[in-house]
């Protein structure tokens, strides 16, 4: 399993950030790479990270939870997006190993939970003139 990277992002153009530009947290190198892209891209009018809560019901514990999508941004063309950043392997059901252990069960539960989150995000986007996308390392680029 890959090491997790976490830190505070300091934007080059803080006025483009919709929120507190001193409290932008990234939880992976993919998220950080997306932040740099949104911050420095002239086509982006504004962007935010984990600023809007989406309410969803977990199919695991049947309770209501809050989900904060990784990014929301608006292009100067007027198009608005909500984006979740995930490793490619987490976008599909885990492959069933010959011997099922705890890691397989944890991956399965995480996949089920993510599907519920993403469905709630899609519903939210439909009612708020946003397009929901899931970006992986294949969309953003490999770790560096």
Question: What does each model-identified segment do?
Answer:
Residues 1-144:
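Electrostatic, structured charged patches in enzyme active sites and in nucleic-acid/phosphate-binding
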């Amino acid at each position: 399993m890959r090491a997790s990277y976490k830190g505070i992002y300091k934007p080059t153009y803080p006025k483009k950030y919709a929120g507190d530009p001193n409290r932008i947290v990234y939880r992976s190198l993919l998220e950080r790479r997306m932040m740099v892209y949104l911050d420095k891209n002239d086509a982006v009018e504004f962007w935010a990270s984990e600023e809007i809560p989406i309410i969803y019901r977990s199919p695991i514990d049947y309770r209501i939870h809050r989900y904060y999508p990784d990014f929301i941004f608006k292009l100067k063309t007027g198009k608005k997006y909500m984006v979740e950043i995930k490793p490619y392997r987490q976008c599909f059901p885990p492959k069933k190993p010959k011997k099922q252990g705890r890691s397989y069960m944890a991956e399965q539960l995480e996949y089920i939970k993510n599907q519920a989150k993403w469905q709630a995000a899609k519903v939210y986007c439909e009612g708020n003139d946003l397009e929901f996308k899931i970006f992986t390392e294949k969309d953003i680029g490999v770790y560096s």
